[in-house]
Structures are given as C-alpha cells and as structure tokens.
C-alpha cells in the first residue's frame, strides 16, 4: 500500500471537483498528512481559467490505482461517478454536498455531507474551524468553485453559508467576486472549437434512480441559440451513449445563467420522464424550462419522483 493519500472528485470533473481536491489536499497536508490531489477526467475551460488565474497545477490524472490505495473522495458519493475500482481501495473520507447515494464500506469513515451549494464551502469552513488560513491559491480556487456551483448565488442551491465562506475566502484571494465571476464564466461558456463529446462530458454524471439508469450533462452558457449548430451531432452522440451504455434516458441541460433557465435535450426510451417531471412537452427532443439552474436540486429530485410515480 502506498504511503500517499489521493484526494479526488468525480468523473468528468467540474470546477468544484478539481478545486475541492486541491484545497482539501492543502488542508490535510497542513494537518500532517501526506496527500496528493487527483482527478478522474479532463479539465474544463472554466476550471483551466481558475487554475491559470491562481497559478495552480492541474491535479494528477488517477488511473489504475493499486488495491488498498488510501483515497479520500470529494464532491460525490455515488459509485457510478467515482474511481472504477473503488471497492478495492481504502476509502478514508468523503466530503460532499449531494444526496446520500450508494457508496458503502465495511468500516466506519469520516463522512461530512452538508446541504450547501458547494463542496468547497464545506472545505473552506473546515479551514476556519481549525484556525488554519488557506493559501491565496487555495482560497482563490475555493472561491472559483463556490462561484461556479452556485452560479454566483443565482442557483437555488445557494445558502447563507456559501455567501459567508465566499466573502471570507475572497479577502484572502484578493478578488472581487463579481468581476472575477464574469471573467471565469466568459472563459468557461465558450463552445468554440469544442466537439460534441467534449461539450457533453464537461460536466456529466450518471445516476441510478430507482430502477432507471439516467445520464445528465449540464453545460453553462450565455448563448443557448449558439448551440443550434451542434444539436444534430449532439443528439447522435447522446443516442449512441443510450445504446452503448444501456441508459433509459440521457439528458443535456443547456443552462443560460443570464436568462436563468435551461434548454433540456433528451434521448432514450424513457424521455417521457422529462415531460412528467417538469410538466412540459418535449418537441424534437428539446424543451426550454424557465428557472431550472441546478441539476442537483431542480432536476434529479423531480426525475426521481417521476420514476417512483409520486
């Protein structure tokens, strides 16, 4: 068993997944542990902007981890989103802000899960609880994660804690959250030069909801109309994913952070779940739903209820 403890977020990592791993690794190392941040996929343009802005290296891409390797996971607690051989590893901790899912251990672990808008909000709180000041780099990355996950407090997942922690971290990082958010979102929402596969997998998660296997990708944009040229190829890619990976439905949320709503594109034999969950009617595999900003709070719960017949 290696001496190192790897800390990683979920597959198809978003900004919170990457930044939380880096920030929590710094905290654990300051507490005397030997940790290394990792990742389970490519980095998005938004995350790349944050890393470059705060002069941080991308975490190590984790592949083929040996049995009993010590690991801490952040920003998820769902097996389908985690390391492929998680059951062979030695899971030490989980830090997360999502629903309690299906990861199990045969021994007790430290598991901190809170109903806040971002995992970095929890990790930032842990710094302050322990009286440890994060570096400017770690503070900036946690700010980036909170801004990203809460859409700068536009998302309904936002809590008072998110606002409080961001305010403290922004002082350490020496940034104006509004100005920085505008720059980060602008960098992150550009689709120019991307393939449909890159767009879809920039923030994609698989869920087992009741007896259904559902895939949900979310792409933040400032221009939904600009996606039209990608739609045909995107539907072909999503249909292939449904067939190859036995999904009941695959969804893409194109979330407009200015208009505060999402265009939902859906494929698969159970796309009727979208109609039922949101009281809408898909037309040509798509429907715009005002007010939908959060996959976690506004998409997964109604889909679950639709599946369960509630």
Curated annotation (Swiss-Prot):
Xref: SUPFAM superfamilies: DHH phosphoesterases (SSF64182)
Cofactor remark: Binds 2 manganese ions per subunit.
GO cellular component: cytoplasm
Cofactor: Mn(2+)
Compartments, as annotated in UniProt: Cytoplasm
Keyword entries, A-Z: Cytoplasm, Hydrolase, Manganese, Metal-binding
Binding site residues for Mn(2+) 2: 16, 75, 97, 149
Family per record: Belongs to the PPase class C family.
Name by which UniProt lists this protein: Probable manganese-dependent inorganic pyrophosphatase
Provenance organism: Clostridium acetobutylicum (strain ATCC 824 / DSM 792 / JCM 1419 / IAM 19013 / LMG 5710 / NBRC 13948 / NRRL B-527 / VKM B-1787 / 2291 / W)
Lineage: Bacteria, Bacillati, Bacillota, Clostridia, Eubacteriales
